[in-house]
Amino acid sequence: MKPHFLAVALVSLVLSVAGAVPFAQAPGPRPDTVDLAAIQLIKDEGLQRSQVMDTAWNLTEVFGPRLTNSPAVRAAAEWAARRLTGWGLANVRQETWGPFGRGWANEMFTATVVAPQPFPLIAAPRAWTPGTNGPVTADIVAPNIRTDQDMAAWSGKLDGKIVLLGAPVDVRPLFTPLGRRFTGQELADLETQPINAGRGRGGRAGGPANADFNQRYMQYLAKEGVVATIEPASGRNDHGAILVTGSPATYRDTSPPVVTPQIVIASEHYNRIARLLAGKVPVQLELNVRNRFFDQPLDAFNLVGEIPGTDRADEVVMLGAHFDSWHAGTGATDNAAGSAVMMEAMRILKTTGLRMRRTIRLALWTGEEQGLLGSRAYVKQQFADRDTMALRPGHAKLAAYYNMDNGTGAVRGVYLQGNEAVRPVFASWTEPFNNLGMTTLSVRSTMGSDQVAFDEVGLPGFQFIQDPVEYGTHSHHTNMDVFDRLQAEDLMKNAVIVAAFAYHTANRETLLPRKALPRARTAETR
């Protein structure tokens, strides 16, 4: 769905402007100067000759899902490096970090119920799980094992079976659309300061014990000779979408615990099977899963490239997005969209020939989906150790890090990560894009992506506020995260905005204001 206001905004986006003028600002810190002539060049290149969708298409449909340390992510990175080099970026390279662990790829997957009536399943294997060593047909059972006593009672009865894990999912009808834009009220709410009114709700007791039982249960199923396990999708997405990530079995261990093939299926299909079994109707499944592990190399990498600066080339502005994805779809909204936008922003800046005083560096991370591993390794090597807060020389030289990882939606503003001092600066840089819907500066911090790796060591790391579109409702980590979910106009506009922010950060007289340095994590645990 592409609202009419976006088409109108894009028609009016390229304006004939020139010169550098400061924007009006309420009394307080002096606003930054905005180079409108540079913005005009950036808009013209980014909206008239964009390559962002071609980049996204290559990442998603030519190379497919880009699981960390898989052959596909390495092939995609080699292609991206060639593209960046062809655009004229300097120092394009893969920087190794790790060790990460084994690579993995699914090479074949079919799952069809063959009795009592045949129907194919919407399903996918969990990453880093084994295959079936060829096609198998087996009865499905629902033992409902919850305790060690249950395991003892079922011992010897599960050999050659396929086991259901978990209860049926309550699938709700859709009374609201899957895709949406932020409303004015929602954006206004983001600008308010969050208040912690109390201690909050404590964590649920028994978590570690449950995790320990689950690990023992999976090993028990493998020992009992179970053919495979089947579990429902999370219930968050439903309606044909399945959310699939990795196995609890570690990818870091070259000799991990033996587990069975693990399959995630659509909630509707899971519920049908569970109801048949509850009605004493036998169910048989034909399954063929071919998964492959790659034990070399065990180290992963980040892809880096630069546009060198001039008189302040030792100072750096960074743009980043995670390059890795999960595997059920092709990693389009999460996060080929962000990677393509950041690559396109670099192309725009290089093609326009604009002069940047500071070096602009692009970093495409891997290991984000496993816990910001690539970006945290880079920050520790280049800037600071988050545990001890021992600073490296590069810490004082980073002007800012800008991250893109909120799907395909249009940029509506910036999360300031609690850095109120940067508000007047960003207000000036945002104003030329107000008519495109970029109006919001939220003091709130947003978590869960690579800007956190910078923010947690006191560096100015920022994430853009983006329209949700279908990100949390349909595409995030699902089999539906494919090229068709991408919104071309939004990605084109986002690349222009990122390029403008990078340009102004690179040419600002001083570095962006920073928050106070956080305490060392080791000190907090004493």
What is each PLM-predicted segment?
Residues 26-38, 57, 61-198:
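Noncatalytic luminal/extracellular "stalk/propeptide" segments of secretory-pathway proteins
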Residues 23-30, 197-208, 236, 526:
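Disordered, low-complexity segments in secreted/periplasmic proteins that are enriched in proline
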Residues 33-70, 241-242, 324-325, 400-409, ...:
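N-terminal capping segment at the start of a domain
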Residues 37-38, 114-115, 120-153, 249-332, ...:
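Soluble metallo-hydrolase cores and metallopeptidase-like ectodomains found primarily
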Residues 205-210, 215-218, 222-223, 228, ...:
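Active-site-adjacent substrate-binding region
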Residues 39-47, 61-72, 138-144, 152-153, ...:
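Second-shell loop/turn segments in exported
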Residues 116-120, 133-138, 156, 160-162, ...:
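Metal-dependent peptidase/peptidase-like ectodomains
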Residues 8-20:
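Bacterial N-terminal signal peptides
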